[in-house]
Amino acid sequence: MEAAHSVPVQDVLSRFGVAESCGLSPEQVRRNREKYGPNELPAEERKSLWELVLEQFEDLLVRILLMAAFLSFILAWFEEGEESTTAFVEPIVIIMILIANAVVGVWQERNAESAIEALKEYEPEMGKVIRADRSGVQRIRARDIVPGDIVEVAVGDKVPADIRIIEIRSTTLRVDQSILTGESMSVIKHADPIPDPRAVNQDKKNMLFSGTNIAAGKAVGIVIATGVYTEIGKIRNQMVETEPEKTPLQQKLDEFSQQLSKVIFLVCIAVWVINISHFSDPVHGGSWFRGAIYYFKTSVALAVAAIPEGLPAVITTCLALGTRRMAKKNAIVRSLPSVETLGCTSVICSDKTGTLTTNQMSVCRMFIMEKVEGTQCSLHEFSITGSTYAPEGQILKDEKPVRCGQYDGLVELATICALCNDSSLDYNESKKVYEKVGEATETALTCLVEKMNVFDTDTSKLSKVERANACNSVIKHLMRKECTLEFSRDRKSMSVYCTPTGPGHNSAGSKMFVKGAPESVIERCTHVRVGTAKVPLTPPVREKILSQIRDWGMGTDTLRCLALATHDAPVQRETMQLHDSTTFTHYETNLTFVGCVGMLDPPRKEVTSSIEMCRKAGIRVIMITGDNKGTAVAICRRIGIFTESEDVAGKAYTGREFDELSPEAQRQACREARCFARVEPAHKSRIVEYLQSFNEITAMTGDGVNDAPALKKAEIGIAMGSGTAVAKSAAEMVLSDDNFSTIVSAVEEGRAIYNNMKQFIRYLISSNVGEVVCIFLTAILGLPEALIPVQLLWVNLVTDGLPATALGFNPPDLDIMDKLPRNPKEPLISGWLFFRYLAIGVYVGLATVGAATWWFLYDAEGPQVSFHQLRNFMRCTEDNPIFEGVNCEIFESRYPTTMALSVLVTIEMCNALNSVSENQSLLRMPPWLNIWLLGAIVMSMALHFFILYVKPMPLIFQVTPLSWPQWVVVLKISLPVILLDEGLKYLSRNHLEGEEDKK
């Protein structure tokens, strides 16, 4: 039923045709169950194992590799002689890589906690209903509850459906609905209609929402929504409809895959077509078909060479290392690709409570009466330091510390704060912090009493556990609390009846201590306390007090104020009707005003500097809160989102103001806004959508079930460590310390990771370009194979993979947070950089072909044939006069491929050294700045020696050990790549960086 909160209860009962006293008939229950379905959230439809496996092969490069493996397998059947066994190595290795990749992908998806499944944890198993088929209240399974059911809830119960309250059967009804609204304080409910049909959930004080908990009291209500129609069900539907967005890196790699696949296809076709004239060469036995197959194999080798097989593993490893570094900074990353996405975050939408603020209410101002003379009066004003629950801080008057025991008014104020209170402080020894036990507001008063220490209690020798409530305990030993008159909406206050302890004391010394909303309490005051005297409360004095409270409430801090008062001669406790809350207001009359305290949820100390850092980094911070607009704007000014004098028109909106705008106006509002107050979860999702329409990369924080859809929709969903399981499951990152500054540290880490990732992606791609150039050159020039597919796989996966991974440890730039967020559409490799790595790649290709050719032409241990003979090696027969005196088998020697492979590996190690910095010379940024890289290079070379010198590896990789003179040639051919890249870096620094800055 829509807007059930805005109509009288009788209208809701009539709508469902039910009487409060007897409930639904069995026939009505059956009809409603058929109409609305069971009261449960449907389980998530999970993909089958087969679907998950197939998904791992949707990547274009993976498909090309799969095709290459399939073709290699078929071609291996046609091999003859010694090659018939080694021919199977290549397809087997490729298939093993693909299987390993698929297993990891499936395992990650299977183990991902589902936010939708986590929602089901909030469903209660049982509910208490009144139905016509049985007298009294009966317990039934919660899934069997239907709309129209009359339900009873009491303290400790989990609400089984969305319920409109009919009647509250206790003094008050408090509900903890933090999972749904994010509010940390329990909410006091009532049964009266809410006149606003468009009220947000926080304002629907006559509604109970499915999955929330009854903190105190008892009530009866009528079910108005079940299952997917409840507020929590709507959140589930939003999450189902939210398609996860690909991260900028995933999009880049997809684009790269598509471009690379087109290039591979064209180059493979070109190599095959160019060599059609060689299909009938004698080396193929004169068979055109065998020649075609041979060059087809070359094309497959080219495809294998062009694909950076090690890239997915290296990226995963780099991101995993990044997550470890982030975890040390209290940011737990749940989705690896999001590590990189953090680097291009341009907007951070942050909750106020607990993220920008401490979520630890603290009293920062208080006043008592100084003197009252006729119509004139003055106040003693105090400020209090310390912004957490730790009982540490000073009471200051005119910026100077004071001893509270000197002021009689402060002694009485502390007494009221300690006794008119059901909360306490607790020292958590494992976390080493003080925590609240009970309501945040009351805990702030408890903490104030500890800071005031009005009886000068010696706390120096107490442990932190004993220190937590030491001063409160002293006061509680002097006065005994007899009963509590709980808070109620009509009087907006609560009070306690206390009697002095110890012998000789009787009820004659009893007092009633009251705390509550200032207007309500002061209205019932007839006197004010000045020292120990009681002075009549005149209209001018009343106005002075209320004026001070208004200043605190409406000023820059927008403090939450509580008035504290005493009844010096309350009625006898025995005559009080404690079961009837309507009588409480009669007992709380003729009060004496003692003082007032102003409290707030203070901003975290480090937040202001973090927001300034965001401003320098070009990141816009938007505060999104369920709090009222005045408080939200005040906090924004305190932490630097707004300046002190900035006009917030068009920059701060309430949820209602935002809804009243047209869709286009809403979109434009999101472009400028920095504060949204009194918002609901649906607003968060809409804000993310509008920001994404401007190509903003958005990080969104949240902790409640209600935040899950927005967390899922944003590029970076950030859940609080203290948040719900649903929010954590929907998020990419969890802040274990709930601190905004941790987000900024994570963004900084994300930027550093992206810079390092660019370095190793370029490093790997320049290697692949070199391999492609090598195979292309040998095919075009008609030279023997310089590198075979299994060798290419070894280089791409192992020898290149280790240094590439180590490049992830490159130190970040010092000015990394002084730059604007990078454009997510900025290509990984563009313009000059593309030319640079193409130049390096061409050198790699020429060097590998040159090394193989050197062995044929000049090596003392080689055949020393002419270049013409080498180019026509396929025509080599005993009868061909060109090859007179040449043994044709030498063209199948393993030495040239070993030379080429050794040059490729050595050049790549030099190339890794070049990648320590994109533009800085090795003389300015030496390799030992990244000790991991030096270790990786040593390891890669050791593995290369392993396949050359340890049997049976030479047979598998079709290589052979090299002599020392051959190694000298390898080094001579390889080392110039350092000089080449140094020259290109010099051009970058001195000629191109300035031009890019001008752009």
Curated annotation (Swiss-Prot):
Found in spleen, lung, intestine and brain. Ca(2+) 2 binds at residues 304-305, 307, 309, 796, 800. One of its GO terms (molecular function) is metal ion binding. Its cofactor is Mg(2+). It catalyses: Ca(2+)(in) + ATP + H2O = Ca(2+)(out) + ADP + phosphate + H(+). Its EC number is 7.2.2.10. It is a multi-pass membrane protein. InterPro entries: ATPase_P-typ_cation-transptr_C (IPR006068), ATPase_P-typ_cation-transptr_N (IPR004014), ATPase_P-typ_cyto_dom_N (IPR023299), ATPase_P-typ_P_site (IPR018303), ATPase_P-typ_TM_dom_sf (IPR023298), ATPase_P-typ_transduc_dom_A_sf (IPR008250), HAD-like_sf (IPR036412), HAD_sf (IPR023214). Its main location: endoplasmic reticulum. Residues 788-808 are annotated as: Interaction with phospholamban 2. Residues 70-89, 274-295, 778-787, 852-897, 950-964 are lumenal. Inhibited by sarcolipin (SLN), phospholamban (PLN) and myoregulin (MRLN). Enhanced by DWORF; DWORF increases activity by displacing sarcolipin (SLN), phospholamban (PLN) and myoregulin (MRLN). Residues 370-400 are annotated as: Interaction with phospholamban 1. It is an enzyme of class 7 (translocase). This magnesium-dependent enzyme catalyzes the hydrolysis of ATP coupled with the transport of calcium. Transports calcium ions from the cytosol into the sarcoplasmic/endoplasmic reticulum lumen. Contributes to calcium sequestration involved in muscular excitation/contraction. Interacts with sarcolipin (SLN). Interacts with phospholamban (PLN). Interacts with myoregulin (MRLN). Interacts with DWORF. This is Sarcoplasmic/endoplasmic reticulum calcium ATPase 3. The gene is ATP2A3.
